[in-house]
């Protein structure tokens, strides 16, 4: 059994595919998968690879993705390419693809790799073959059942949680991205088997959801926790509320597995963000999550000043490994990005922290009141365990011929010019609209339409589990809390 007892060093599995950095959202788009490659290269040069098991993720199949997403949406993602977009204009509108979420070469393969790492990490945790699994290419928390959103197409987090639910009665999801984790909250809004806890900027900011009063519905009432924050939050303010809230959640909910989305756009100086956290302040959340000694899946997310994303996720990998690394950056393939200081840690800016101690205390107390409404954590039900998404011999071992990798075949047309990897502020106006009402009307209409189309598919996880147990069939978690809810 892999689980470490107490505060000892944990076994860590890390998922990375060398092709991930070649995918390119387009000129001026703030989302740059290249940041994953920068992170990987930096942690290699720190020598962290010696302390963990590194796996190349399998490419998640369409069948795996439709455990949550609609068949027609995944079929669309498989089919659309830059050279056939004109044939899909109606579907592009329906599935919200084309602006914030552009069509680019290898889009579906990018989704397969991002999802493959998260699902494989969940399987590894389920098998008790690791204490922690890390997939920095995952954490794409805005994707909906039948809609792309906020640079996210396939919700790898929801799919990984569905995998964890095969073995774990209760899963806790924590989101420290600056943007509300709306796609994950929406997927599990009506079940008590997943608690979602999101700390995010709220008010005239994408995606416009995550109000303090959004607490879940039906069986899921009080199982959605939202901490709305204002501009400029710093390490001290964040630390004063994060640990108490997560400790109270652990006490009241008693999950047996945790998923932590480590979006790095909550760092100071992020191109799209407005918080003032340092890498150390951000990583404190990883330290807190680790202290509970539960199976932990760590995922990426947002982060648009890419030199700082690489710093952050490298340091958080070291924190996962209980490994101290020097502030002086080692020479690496992207060394020039980290000038002029060439240090691992960043300083906060002098921006005003609009989160007063009174405001933070008031929100914390309101959330504590909600958490006190939770019933005592339900006991574990005995039930047949469904088949794992990744078989022992399929995704984890590197059995593919490296000469047949996608990068050899097609990376030339996916590699961006050097200046596209810069962090300059004048890079273009592309990207996420940080306004709450951006296309809200159209979105609501689409969600209502999807609601009608998928009504028959929607059932509660537990009811489905019971019926499957009675019939002796394999449990299919599709439809687990997949209610499409309009933005508040």
UniProtKB/Swiss-Prot annotation:
> Which reaction(s) does the protein catalyse, per the Swiss-Prot or TrEMBL entry?
N(6)-acetyl-L-lysyl-[histone] + H2O = L-lysyl-[histone] + acetate; N(6)-acetyl-L-lysyl-[protein] + H2O = L-lysyl-[protein] + acetate; N(6)-(2E)-butenoyl-L-lysyl-[protein] + H2O = (2E)-2-butenoate + L-lysyl-[protein]; N(6)-(2-hydroxyisobutanoyl)-L-lysyl-[protein] + H2O = 2-hydroxy-2-methylpropanoate + L-lysyl-[protein]
Q: Which gene encodes it?
A: Hdac2
**Post-translational modification, as annotated:** S-nitrosylated by GAPDH. In neurons, S-nitrosylation at Cys-262 and Cys-274 does not affect enzyme activity, but induces HDAC2 release from chromatin. This in turn increases acetylation of histones surrounding neurotrophin-dependent gene promoters and promotes their transcription. In embryonic cortical neurons, S-Nitrosylation regulates dendritic growth and branching.
Q: Which residues carry this modification: N6-acetyllysine?
A: 75, 221
Binding of 1D-myo-inositol 1,4,5,6-tetrakisphosphate occurs at: 28, 32, 271
Extent of Basic and acidic residues compositional bias: 402-417, 429-481
Q: Which domain of life is it from?
A: Eukaryota
Name the Gene Ontology biological process terms: cardiac muscle cell development; cardiac muscle cell proliferation; cellular response to trichostatin A; chromatin organization; chromatin remodeling; circadian regulation of gene expression; dendrite development; embryonic digit morphogenesis
Region described as Disordered: spans on this chain = 389-488
Keyword annotations: Acetylation, Biological rhythms, Calcium, Chromatin regulator, Cytoplasm, Hydrolase, Isopeptide bond, Metal-binding, Nucleus, Phosphoprotein, Repressor, S-nitrosylation, Transcription, Transcription regulation, Ubl conjugation, Zinc
Broad class of the protein's primary localization: nucleus
Per the UniProt entry, the Enzyme Commission number(s) are 3.5.1.98, 3.5.1.-
Where Ca(2+) 1 binds, per the record, is at 175, 177, 179, 198-199
Return one GO MF term: histone H4K16 deacetylase activity, hydrolytic mechanism
Name by which UniProt lists this protein: Histone deacetylase 2
Which intervals carry biased composition (Acidic residues)?
418-428
Q: Which cofactor does it need?
A: Zn(2+); Ca(2+)
Q: Which residues bind Zn(2+)?
A: 177, 179, 265
**Quaternary structure and partners:** Part of the core histone deacetylase (HDAC) complex composed of HDAC1, HDAC2, RBBP4 and RBBP7, the core complex associates with SIN3, SAP18 and SAP30 to form the SIN3 HDAC complex. Component of the nucleosome remodeling and deacetylase (NuRD) repressor complex, composed of core proteins MTA1, MTA2, MTA3, RBBP4, RBBP7, HDAC1, HDAC2, MBD2, MBD3, and peripherally associated proteins CDK2AP1, CDK2AP2, GATAD2A, GATAD2B, CHD3, CHD4 and CHD5.
Gene Ontology cellular component list: chromatin; cytoplasm; ESC/E(Z) complex; heterochromatin; histone deacetylase complex; nucleoplasm; nucleus; NuRD complex
